[in-house]
């Protein structure tokens, strides 16, 4: 029976990497002091800035043959970004020591997309809580669970999934539902690993949700009049008021506004998922370095 349970909750992410092209936009207004920049991130920021400048120049260059050298393509900006991502993953992995990571944040903040990238970079397995719940409910979608069984049933299944993941698995990256943070028992399970909060401006989140629709997000279904963006922003603001404080319990905070400032971009929508994943690794490493007298791993 145990083997059957493990099989039912197994979920691989590697075949879904085509979803990376979507740029996550997100959720929050949170007053805090600017994250202290360290030498490592300044190097990353400078490299990514140069990469972005190169990408813009390349797009406007009509002579595409200039990208060829001795019969092969030069390294693309994507390749450079992946090299930086791989390097940051290699740096943080000794600190993790096999511990799992749980991504938390408002709905639509990019937890699944960023989580897949982080898992792939570390060689970890990726799980999506919503997908596990749907599998446990014999393929019933999240929206249908809310409609036919109620939110309380969904929350119970969510807690069951987090419990199984925390007790039965190591070296995994888990994308949680936006409301996972409201139940204290869920934090008990997530704190067995490292929790990472993707902090995204509410306005950016509302724009993204308005663009893709609210069909798969039952908590955004309402009868408010007005345009979709305004309705989404109003509902998200209400949800944030109820959950905002809970997100601060996470081990590490990844602020998309801070990344945007560091890299000199105009908007959080300019960020790529890989850039967000790089910042997540930075914040996780910073947290673990400060964690109760933890020594730096040998060779670092």
From Swiss-Prot:
The record's subcellular location field reads:
Plastid, Chloroplast
* Summary of subunit composition and partner proteins: Monomer.
Its activity is regulated as follows: Inactivated by heat (37 degrees Celsius).
- Any idea of its EC number? 2.7.1.71
Show the HAMAP family listed in the entry.
Shikimate_kinase
List residues binding Mg(2+). Answer: 112
Q: Top enzyme class of this protein?
A: transferase
* PANTHER family assigned: SHIKIMATE KINASE, SHIKIMATE KINASE 2, CHLOROPLASTIC
What protein family does this chain belong to?
Belongs to the shikimate kinase family.
Instruction: State what this protein does.
Output: Catalyzes the specific phosphorylation of the 3-hydroxyl group of shikimic acid using ATP as a cosubstrate.
List, separated by semicolons, the cofactors it needs. Answer: Mg(2+)
Q: Looking at the keywords, is Acetylation present?
A: no
Consequence of gene loss (knockout): No visible phenotype under normal growth conditions.
Protein name per the record: Shikimate kinase 2, chloroplastic
Spell out the reaction equation it catalyses.
Answer: shikimate + ATP = 3-phosphoshikimate + ADP + H(+)
GO annotation, cellular component aspect: chloroplast
Where does the record say the transit peptide is?
1-58
Pfam families in the cross-refs: SKI
Q: Where does substrate bind?
A: 130, 155, 178
The cofactor note from the UniProt entry for this protein is:
Binds 1 Mg(2+) ion per subunit.
MF-aspect GO terms? ATP binding; metal ion binding; shikimate kinase activity
Pathway connected to this protein: Metabolic intermediate biosynthesis; chorismate biosynthesis; chorismate from D-erythrose 4-phosphate and phosphoenolpyruvate: step 5/7
Keyword terms of this UniProt record = Amino-acid biosynthesis, Aromatic amino acid biosynthesis, ATP-binding, Chloroplast, Kinase, Magnesium, Metal-binding, Nucleotide-binding, Plastid, Transferase, Transit peptide
Please tell me where ATP binds in this chain. 105-112, 217
Under InterPro entries, the record lists: P-loop_NTPase, Shikimate/glucono_kinase, Shikimate_kinase/TSH1, Shikimate_kinase_CS
């Amino acid at each position: 029976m145990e083997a059957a349970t493990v099989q039912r909750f197994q979920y691989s992410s590697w075949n879904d990497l085509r979803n990376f092209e979507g740029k996550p936009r997100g959720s929050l207004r949170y007053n805090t002091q600017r994250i202290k920049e360290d030498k490592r991130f300044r190097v990353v920021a400078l490299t990514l800035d140069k990469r972005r400048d190169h990408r813009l120049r390349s797009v406007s260059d009509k002579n595409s043959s200039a990208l060829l050298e001795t019969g092969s393509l030069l390294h693309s900006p994507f390749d450079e970004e992946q090299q930086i991502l791989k390097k940051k993953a290699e740096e943080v992995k000794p600190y993790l020591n096999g511990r799992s990571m749980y991504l938390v944040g408002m709905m639509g903040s990019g937890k699944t997309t960023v989580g897949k990238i982080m898992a792939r970079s570390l060689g970890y397995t990726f799980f999506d809580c919503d997908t596990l719940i749907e599998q446990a409910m014999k393929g019933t979608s999240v929206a249908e669970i809310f409609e036919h069984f109620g939110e309380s049933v969904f929350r119970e299944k969510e807690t069951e999934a987090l419990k199984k993941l925390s007790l039965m698995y190591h070296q995994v990256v888990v994308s949680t539902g936006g409301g996972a943070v409201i139940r204290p028992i869920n934090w008990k399970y997530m704190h067995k690993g490292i929790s990472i909060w993707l902090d995204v401006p509410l306005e950016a989140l509302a724009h993204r949700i308005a663009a893709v629709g609210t069909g798969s997000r039952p908590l955004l279904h309402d009868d408010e009049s007005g345009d979709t963006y305004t309705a989404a922003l109003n509902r998200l603001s209400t949800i944030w008021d109820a959950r905002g404080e809970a997100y601060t319990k996470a081990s590490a905070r990844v602020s998309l506004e801070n990344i945007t400032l560091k890299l000199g971009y105009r908007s959080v929508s300019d960020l790529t998922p890989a850039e967000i994943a790089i910042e997540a690794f930075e914040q996780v490493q910073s947290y673990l370095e400060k964690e109760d007298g933890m020594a730096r791993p040998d060779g670092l």
